[in-house]
Amino acid sequence: MASLKSIIRQGKQTRSDLKTLRNTGKVPAIVYGYGTKNTSVKVDEVEFIKVIREVGRNGVIELGVGSKTIKVMVSDYQFDPLKNQITHIDFLAINMTEERTVEVPVQLVGEAVGTKEGGVVEQPLFNLEVTATPDNIPESIEVDISELEINDSLSVEDIKVSGDFTIENEASDSIVTVVPPTEEPTEEEIEAMEGEAATEEPEVVGEEKEDESGEDQKEE
C-alpha cells in the first residue's frame, strides 16, 4: 500500500485557477465515498504517477487529506493526450471489508508453440471483471499461452488463478486463441486470377453505328 499527500483546495476555483494549478505540476482532484465528505484537493502529478505504477490501477492508496489519512482507490481520472497531462482525479474512499467489482487486465505469459508454425495470437478479451475486497484485488491476471498450438484457445474456465477473488465473466468467454496463418496465393493462382480479370475489348457502339451509316450511304 502506497502513500500520497494531498492539499485541500479552499473555495470555488475558476477555469483559469485550475489551468494555473495544472501548469505548476498539480492535479485537481476530489475525494468522496465511505466515511468522508466530498473534499476538493490537489496532488502532485509526478508523485501520483509513481504511486499508480507501484500499486496498479486498482491498488489501495493511503491518501493524506488535512490531518487525516484515508484509504482510497482511483475511481476515475481524465488525461489530456495533447498536453500529456492528467487533468483531474476522482479518489473513492473505501471500506476495506466491502467487496468491489473492477476490471483487471489480462497479461499473456510465454510464447505460443503455434506461432513458430506461423500462427497468430489473437486476444479478444483484455480485461476480466473481478470481485474482491480492495486488498485482494489482483494487479493483473496472468494467462500462460506457451502450450497453445494453431487453432487452440483458452477461455475463462481454462485459466488457473490463485487468490481470494471471483471472476465474474462467463466461463465460455474466449480470452486468447492462435489462428492459422493467412496463406498467400501461389504463382499459378495469381496468374489464374489475372487471366479471369483480363477481358476482351468492349464493343464500341459509336463506331458500329458509323460503319452501318456508311454502308447505308453506299447502298443509296
From Swiss-Prot:
<dbReference type="InterPro" id="IPR001021">
    <property type="entry name" value="Ribosomal_bL25_long"/>
</dbReference>
<dbReference type="GO" id="GO:0003735">
    <property type="term" value="F:structural constituent of ribosome"/>
</dbReference>
<comment type="function">
    <text>This is one of the proteins that binds to the 5S RNA in the ribosome where it forms part of the central protuberance.</text>
</comment>
<dbReference type="Pfam" id="PF14693">
    <property type="entry name" value="Ribosomal_TL5_C"/>
</dbReference>
<dbReference type="InterPro" id="IPR020056">
    <property type="entry name" value="Rbsml_bL25/Gln-tRNA_synth_N"/>
</dbReference>
<dbReference type="GO" id="GO:0006412">
    <property type="term" value="P:translation"/>
</dbReference>
<dbReference type="InterPro" id="IPR011035">
    <property type="entry name" value="Ribosomal_bL25/Gln-tRNA_synth"/>
</dbReference>
<dbReference type="InterPro" id="IPR020930">
    <property type="entry name" value="Ribosomal_uL5_bac-type"/>
</dbReference>
<dbReference type="GO" id="GO:0008097">
    <property type="term" value="F:5S rRNA binding"/>
</dbReference>
<dbReference type="Pfam" id="PF01386">
    <property type="entry name" value="Ribosomal_L25p"/>
</dbReference>
<feature type="region of interest" description="Disordered">
    <location>
        <begin position="179"/>
        <end position="220"/>
    </location>
</feature>
<keyword id="KW-0699">rRNA-binding</keyword>
<dbReference type="InterPro" id="IPR029751">
    <property type="entry name" value="Ribosomal_L25_dom"/>
</dbReference>
<dbReference type="InterPro" id="IPR037121">
    <property type="entry name" value="Ribosomal_bL25_C"/>
</dbReference>
<protein>
    <recommendedName>
        <fullName>Large ribosomal subunit protein bL25</fullName>
    </recommendedName>
</protein>
<keyword id="KW-0689">Ribosomal protein</keyword>
<comment type="similarity">
    <text>Belongs to the bacterial ribosomal protein bL25 family. CTC subfamily.</text>
</comment>
<keyword id="KW-0687">Ribonucleoprotein</keyword>
<dbReference type="InterPro" id="IPR020057">
    <property type="entry name" value="Ribosomal_bL25_b-dom"/>
</dbReference>
<dbReference type="GO" id="GO:0022625">
    <property type="term" value="C:cytosolic large ribosomal subunit"/>
</dbReference>
<comment type="subunit">
    <text>Part of the 50S ribosomal subunit; part of the 5S rRNA/L5/L18/L25 subcomplex. Contacts the 5S rRNA. Binds to the 5S rRNA independently of L5 and L18.</text>
</comment>
<feature type="compositionally biased region" description="Acidic residues">
    <location>
        <begin position="184"/>
        <end position="220"/>
    </location>
</feature>
<keyword id="KW-0694">RNA-binding</keyword>
